[in-house]
């Protein structure tokens, strides 16, 4: 039997000589349950601009990266979460957190929180109780920033930085791993208390979070994919961050979402892609 790395239950960050503790996500926490409600995940594709958002405002909603800026124009009544999985977002769009984050449930990787400890220390101090750490199962540290070197996390990073092949988790009951996929192994988590599987887009992380929190159905908006060279709805041509989606679209993102849709449907949780741009790419939802 494989011995799996025990993920830390908390992470401590040294911010101006003050220890800030953030708990890891645990699906058994009562406040994490979505109580069998339908959940919308709103990504950042340009199609969001054509979305009738007024029809979605009362449904539990999980935002990712810059889509949280929608709360500046629309009154969402049930913000179920905000997910950031790549620290590069923090460095490229720091003003979004500063302007729109006011203590909503935030789920992010260690690398993201370490970036925030440097760029947004006041936010970390004020709202750390509303934050939860998510661990990528194959590299628990997460996607680090290219631009800055951070050293705020207090425990040693060596084990968490080690890349682990997904095939290592093939017999772990918390994951479904497809090792027959020709490009590279893909997978999906059934409970991200034990880690999430990456697929090249933060929306994939958010979908695993929604399932782990007992959503009845998962509705995806703004996952456009095919027009990834266009600015996100909150960007313009002058400030748009580079997108890696086109590079991994057919090899990783689409097969992973098809696996996720198939597995979650088999557990009674349908996944629906509402993007008019990418809907035709998927064969399971």
Regions found by a protein language model. Give the residues of each.
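Metal-ion/cofactor- or nucleotide/acyl-coenzyme-handling active-site neighborhoods
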Residues: 1-285
């Amino acid at each position: 039997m494989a011995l799996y790395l025990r993920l830390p239950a908390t992470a401590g960050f040294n911010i101006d000589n003050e220890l800030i503790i953030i708990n890891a996500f645990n699906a058994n926490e009562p406040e994490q349950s979505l109580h069998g409600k339908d959940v919308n995940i709103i990504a950042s594709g340009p199609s969001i601009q054509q979305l009738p958002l007024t029809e979605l405002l009362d449904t539990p909603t999980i935002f990712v990266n810059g889509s949280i800026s929608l709360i500046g124009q629309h009154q969402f009544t049930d913000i179920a979460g905000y997910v950031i999985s790549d620290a590069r977002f923090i460095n490229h769009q720091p003003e979004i957190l500063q302007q729109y984050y006011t203590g909503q449930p935030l789920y992010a990787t260690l690398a993201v929180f370490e970036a925030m400890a440097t760029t947004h220390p006041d936010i970390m101090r004020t709202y750390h109780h509303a934050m939860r750490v998510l661990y990528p199962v194959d590299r628990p540290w997460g996607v680090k920033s290219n631009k800055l070197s951070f050293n705020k996390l207090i425990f040693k990073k060596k084990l968490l930085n080690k890349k682990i092949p997904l095939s290592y988790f093939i017999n772990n009951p918390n994951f479904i791993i497809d090792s027959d996929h020709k490009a590279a192994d893909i997978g999906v988590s059934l409970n991200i208390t034990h880690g999430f599987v990456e697929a090249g887009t933060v929306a994939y992380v958010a979908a695993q979070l929604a399932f782990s929190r007992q959503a009845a159905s998962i509705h995806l908006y703004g996952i456009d994919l095919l027009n990834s060279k266009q600015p996100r709805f909150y960007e313009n041509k002058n400030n748009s961050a580079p997108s890696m989606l086109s590079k991994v679209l057919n090899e990783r993102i689409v097969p992973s979402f098809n696996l996720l849709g198939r597995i979650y449907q088999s557990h009674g949780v349908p996944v629906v892609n509402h993007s008019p741009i990418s809907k035709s790419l998927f064969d399971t939802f």
